[in-house]
């Protein structure tokens, strides 16, 4: 079984159990804290992915690192991953958990790149328009790229909506090149 499929299955099971138990918010907070630590500690991630380190030791290390920072339910999940020799999937499970939670909550993550900083009203109008377009609540990550000259580029999953001056110039160049 590929690691992506396994990560998604563990994340789905964790989210299902958290929803049934009514502690989704606690789990989200716990996993956000774990995500930060794992992102900052390459050594921790390397240890979790190492086949040389046995599951019991991985579980003890996770307990030491996160004791008091996460709930007992989260610690039990860590122990399960270690027992099943899947501790190396922890970072991927956290990402899949977030994606599934957003999916179930009708939230879509959108990357918006513009040539100039959008003011609050422009951002609000763009987000509202994207919400209508997707039919979901939009969580936008805004970034700047002065090389775009003007306009915006929006990425929603695998879909890219490119209304930048650079893109329009490239299309014009391509169209003129075909006619010549």
Swiss-Prot record:
It is found in: Cell inner membrane. The keyword Cell division does not apply. It is a peripheral membrane protein. One of its GO terms (molecular function) is proton-transporting ATP synthase activity, rotational mechanism. The keyword Cell inner membrane applies. GO terms for cellular component: plasma membrane; proton-transporting ATP synthase complex. Keywords: ATP synthesis, Cell inner membrane, Cell membrane, CF(1), Hydrogen ion transport, Ion transport, Membrane, Transport. It comes from the Bacteria. It holds the Pfam family OSCP. Belongs to the ATPase delta chain family. F-type ATPases have 2 components, F(1) - the catalytic core - and F(0) - the membrane proton channel. F(1) has five subunits: alpha(3), beta(3), gamma(1), delta(1), epsilon(1). F(0) has three main subunits: a(1), b(2) and c(10-14). The alpha and beta chains form an alternating ring which encloses part of the gamma chain. F(1) is attached to F(0) by a central stalk formed by the gamma and epsilon chains, while a peripheral stalk is formed by the delta and b chains. F(1)F(0) ATP synthase produces ATP from ADP in the presence of a proton or sodium gradient. F-type ATPases consist of two structural domains, F(1) containing the extramembraneous catalytic core and F(0) containing the membrane proton channel, linked together by a central stalk and a peripheral stalk. During catalysis, ATP synthesis in the catalytic domain of F(1) is coupled via a rotary mechanism of the central stalk subunits to proton translocation. This protein is part of the stalk that links CF(0) to CF(1). It either transmits conformational changes from CF(0) to CF(1) or is implicated in proton conduction. NCBIfam families: ATP_synt_delta. This is ATP synthase subunit delta.
């Amino acid at each position: 079984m590929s690691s992506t499929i396994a990560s998604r299955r563990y994340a789905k099971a964790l989210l299902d159990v958290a929803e049934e138990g009514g502690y989704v918010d606690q789990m989200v907070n716990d996993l956000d804290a774990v995500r930060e630590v794992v992102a900052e500690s390459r050594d921790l991630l390397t240890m979790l992915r190492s086949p040389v380190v046995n599951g019991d030791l991985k579980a003890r290390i996770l307990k030491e690192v996160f004791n008091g920072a996460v709930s007992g339910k989260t610690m039990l999940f860590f122990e399960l991953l270690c027992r099943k020799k899947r501790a190396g999937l922890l970072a991927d499970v956290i990402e899949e958990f977030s994606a599934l939670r957003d999916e179930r909550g009708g939230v879509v993550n959108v990357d918006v790149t513009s040539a100039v900083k959008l003011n609050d009203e422009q951002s609000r109008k763009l987000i509202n328009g994207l919400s209508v377009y997707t039919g979901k609540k939009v969580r936008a990550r805004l970034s700047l790229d002065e090389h775009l000259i003007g306009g915006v580029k929006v990425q929603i999953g695998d879909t890219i909506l490119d209304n930048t001056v650079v893109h329009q110039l490239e299309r014009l160049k391509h169209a003129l090149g075909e006619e010549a």
